[in-house]
Amino acid sequence: MIFVGLSHKTAPIEVRERLAIGRDRLPEVLARLTAHPAIGEALVLSTCNRVEIYASPRQQAPAPPRPGSAPPPSDEELSRNNEALRAAVATLVGLGGDAVRGHLAGRVGSDAVLHLFRVAASLDSMVVGEPQILGQMKEAIEVARGAKTLGVRLGRAAHRAIKVGKRVRTETAIGAGQVSVSSVAIDLARQIFADLAGHTALLIGAGDMAEAASKLLVRAGARLIVVNRSPDRAAALAREVGGEPRPWADLERSVIDADIVISSTSSPNYVVTPDLVRRARKARKGRSLFLIDIAVPRDIDPAVNKLDSVYLYDVDDLSQIVAESVEGRAAEAARAEAIVADEAQAFEAWTLERALTPTIVGLRARTRSILVAEVERSLSGKLRHLGVAERQALAMMIDAATNKLLHVPTTRLRAMASDPRVAEHVDSLRELFDIDGAPPENAAASALAEGELRGAVDGPPTPRSARGAAPPASGARGGGSPRHADPRPQAAEDNGVYARQPGGRPAEAGVMAVANPAAAVSAAGLKGA
């Protein structure tokens, strides 16, 4: 898994706003990413403070090398491959230009997972502890699921990230009080006006951040005006908090009436321009105008800051207030970091154990195939008389024996998942049990995980002589003939002791003609682990 992106920590707002990806564009970007031959899964998180892409390679790492095979890729080769993949991701989403490259951050493997978890826990947010990021991440995951770009690995990482965020908010007080970009904006307003009571605040926009800001403004005693392109949304928000809704056409008049303007829309263009502010200044008769722009892309043209008696602040200007907030939450942030580290370690353990799944599946298939072959040999001979109940009991006994035989080896193998020498242990195990060399039809016996033996449903075979047919010739199997002698006992074929392969040819004794084990593994979500 890799991560490529930028945030308020690596790029100024003028860079972030150029690269912001709106929700309506996310499916297109996700499709472009997963169309790349090297990318199997993708997740895009775009907020006012970050644009981040998480991706997982289409092909997982190969199984441990067999003796005499080519050596595994070196750390240098893996690094080059990861760098190439990161470069491809950056280019596909428009982050590959020279002007942007210096602002990019990247992580690979467990470091990428750790970063994802820290973001979900709001530890990487401009305002540590802010709750909005968890909702934004849920929305990004929902879009990726809808676009079918989340698979086993990245899908699980995303799911765990949400759990991590919830756990941090439940087990720590990192989100206590008012912690969000909106709350920081109101704190700034309080610094400008010692008391907001009696002052008029204009809120441009009616989204989540605008709603949060409106409640704080009203609580502080400010008179609130709400302007939004959608009159209905403006009216709904104003009604909820006791403000005054105005149509978009009254934006300039509202700027004239306001002491402070807070803007938070999703517009791709400036909604407050220097010309609008110049006209408003004349009508304001020298009153200072304070504007706080918490939107990305920005709503207010930064050129208005050059006008007399006009003071503009954007999200990057809120950093000093944020720093004070972080200091007060240092202890809770440390507790949150410990939770994130614990969850990241657990995810890494799952990843390592998952890589062992093909070997464990192969070992169980190998063991089961041997037991099945021996039991079916007996069922075609001395135990032909067994009924349905007895055959079902044998099937259960095979399962129980397989589980008991392999419980200790598989438990210890999983415990070795984080051992640097695990590849050597796995290779030895596959060599000792000839897991890679097992005939496909023997491996197919793994389907007995369902607990079936041929004949367990059909019941005991009816002797051929009882159906009016002659008994098997002396040269038939079971009468001392060579292994490949034919014909095989017709009763055995008719009653399922021998399964038929495609084309009607009976399989070897003790072999189950069932689905390809690779397909079964794939259906179980384990292929390529």
From Swiss-Prot:
Q: In which organism is this protein found?
A: Sorangium cellulosum (strain So ce56) (Polyangium cellulosum (strain So ce56))
Name of the encoding gene: hemA
InterPro entries reported for this sequence: 4pyrrol_synth_GluRdtase, 4pyrrol_synth_GluRdtase_dimer, 4pyrrol_synth_GluRdtase_N, GluRdtase_CS, GluRdtase_dimer_dom_sf, GluRdtase_N_sf, NAD(P)-bd_dom_sf, Shikm_DH/Glu-tRNA_Rdtase
Q: Enzyme class, one word?
A: oxidoreductase
HAMAP family according to UniProt: Glu_tRNA_reductase (MF_00087)
Task: Give residues annotated as binding NADP(+).
Answer: G205, A206, G207, D208, M209, A210
**What note about domains is in the entry?**
Possesses an unusual extended V-shaped dimeric structure with each monomer consisting of three distinct domains arranged along a curved 'spinal' alpha-helix. The N-terminal catalytic domain specifically recognizes the glutamate moiety of the substrate. The second domain is the NADPH-binding domain, and the third C-terminal domain is responsible for dimerization.
Which key words tag this protein in UniProt?
NADP, Oxidoreductase, Porphyrin biosynthesis
Q: What does the entry list as the binding residues for substrate? A: T47, C48, N49, R50, S125, E130, P131, Q132, Q136
Entry's transmembrane regions: none
What pathway or pathways are given for this protein in its record? Porphyrin-containing compound metabolism; protoporphyrin-IX biosynthesis; 5-aminolevulinate from L-glutamyl-tRNA(Glu): step 1/2
Q: What does this protein do?
A: Catalyzes the NADPH-dependent reduction of glutamyl-tRNA(Glu) to glutamate 1-semialdehyde (GSA).
Q: Where is the composition biased (Low complexity)?
A: 464-475
Q: What is this protein called?
A: Glutamyl-tRNA reductase
Which Pfam families does the UniProt record give? GlutR_dimer (PF00745), GlutR_N (PF05201), Shikimate_DH (PF01488)
What's this protein's family per the entry?
Answer: Belongs to the glutamyl-tRNA reductase family.
EC number(s) stated in the UniProt entry for this protein: 1.2.1.70
Top-level taxon? Bacteria
What does the record give as the active site? Answer: C48
One GO MF term attached to the UniProt entry:
NADP binding
Residue ranges under compositional bias (Pro residues)? 62-73
